[in-house]
Swiss-Prot record:
Gene3D superfamilies: 3.40.140.20, Methylglyoxal synthase-like domain (3.40.50.1380). It comes from the Bacteria. GO terms for cellular component: cytosol. This is Bifunctional purine biosynthesis protein PurH. One of its GO terms (biological process) is 'de novo' IMP biosynthetic process. Pfam families: AICARFT_IMPCHas, MGS. Keywords: Hydrolase, Multifunctional enzyme, Purine biosynthesis, Transferase. InterPro entries: AICAR_Tfase_dup_dom_sf, Cytidine_deaminase-like, MGS-like_dom, MGS-like_dom_sf, PurH-like. Its EC number is 2.1.2.3, 3.5.4.10. It catalyses: (6R)-10-formyltetrahydrofolate + 5-amino-1-(5-phospho-beta-D-ribosyl)imidazole-4-carboxamide = 5-formamido-1-(5-phospho-D-ribosyl)imidazole-4-carboxamide + (6S)-5,6,7,8-tetrahydrofolate; IMP + H2O = 5-formamido-1-(5-phospho-D-ribosyl)imidazole-4-carboxamide. Belongs to the PurH family. Pathway: Purine metabolism; IMP biosynthesis via de novo pathway; 5-formamido-1-(5-phospho-D-ribosyl)imidazole-4-carboxamide from 5-amino-1-(5-phospho-D-ribosyl)imidazole-4-carboxamide (10-formyl THF route): step 1/1; Purine metabolism; IMP biosynthesis via de novo pathway; IMP from 5-formamido-1-(5-phospho-D-ribosyl)imidazole-4-carboxamide: step 1/1. The gene is purH. Residues 1-147 form the MGS-like domain.
Amino acid sequence: MPSIKRALISLSDKTGAVEFAQTLHKLGVEILSTGGTAKLLADAGVPVIEVADYTGFPEMLDGRVKTLHPKIHGGILGRRDLPEHVAKMEEHGIGNIDLVCVNLYPFAATIAKPNCTLEDAIENIDIGGPTMVRSAAKNWKHVAIVTDPADFPAIAAEMEANNGALSDKTRFNLSRKAFSHTAQYDGMISNYLTSLSDDVLSGTPEIGEFPSQFNQSWIKVQDMRYGENPHQRAAFYRDVYPAAGSLSAYKQLQGKELSYNNIADADAAWEAVKSFDAPACVIVKHANPCGVAVAADTLTAYKLAYATDTTSAFGGIIAFNREVDGETVKQITDNQFMEVLMAPKFTAEALEIAAAKKNVRVLQISLTTPLEAGANRFELKRVGGGLLVQTPDIYRLNRADLKVVSKRQLTEQEWNDLMFVWNVAKYVKSNAIVFGKGGQTYGIGAGQMSRVDSTRIAARKAQDANLDLNGACAASDAFFPFRDGVDVIAEQGIKAIIHPAGSMRDQEVFDAADEHGIAMVVTGVRHFRH
């Protein structure tokens, strides 16, 4: 492993640059640099050589040409193991560059700014940076490329332990990371440019939601033992820039490694529970809520959610949107087996009690952002040979948007109950019917091909749980195609229904509500979930 003798450092994100450069200097490495990076290092007392001085060619064209020079790229691309390369480099006075530390212009931050113009975006497309990164990554056997400041400490430590050298394994891993970095960067540029409206040459073109070519990058978090079933292989990836408060930001505090199904179910539970403002508990099984409740505290919320369907809750995923205390965890572990327990925070006592169930996965995820800020920009669904892309369903109803279509008006408690069951229905697989009262689900009918069957299942679930539906409320994620669903709901003693409307037989459905003395509210918004 030959020692690194010369490094080129040119950074947009300069985190840790000074400390890393100081280590290189102590190891006798000559440092080349440009612009702001050179000034930063020089001001910190690190000897640097400006690239313009090294090449004998000035920086020009407003900084567009700085490192695009044979003395730079020859020094990076030249193979030390080929005599003809070595001879040519000596002939033209090109020295080896053994380490390249480069990250790229902040294109993502630029286009995220309000009123970003096309010119602003174009000027933040890096040219020299990716060229150096790709050159160094291609020649990884002889050159190390560092694109992530988070790698500086490990690289410095390895060099200090090996007389300034890096192993083949390290250089190859850095090369792979570098090519991923430039691929993600170019994909982001492509997405932006192909999203622009037809008036692209105007000063501030409108950015469409869906580019004509869709490029996306993810980072592997873990390989899994298997996928949805044992004969399927699987891995979990996260976004390069994951939304704050999203599942991929989890910190696992205890328990076995998460499985494919654990993650799918945990995501369903987390998305549902964080949609509530009041303290809430959501219990999920096979990506469907089987019990949901809001209450004054986590213990009460859990007891109410669990009471909805104690059978289905077994082996479920349990999520809270508030700090969980020891009393709550004690109640859960006394009641049931669970796969995953999730919350923004746990007390020390809660973690101590959970530790007695060593196989339970305990996940902590910060909830400091509004629901909208914690949502993915896109939801993706693979189909044969293609990809469906849509914006997330984060629509939140305001009471002012709702329309009462029945003769009977609603009590204040019924309004509150309708808003609760409607929010739950949004997270239940279609066709979805949810019964509830007092911030507690009483019955959930999910995933049936006919809406009336989901209605009957919700009624049976409430009956099995000995929950009295008299005076309860019902939500349907889509319109009732016939009055039969309303008739079944009326048989249970339910007094208010919320649904989108939009059926050819809406009037028939409205009339059925009036016949039964049921208050009916329509939303005009559907929440299909497949």
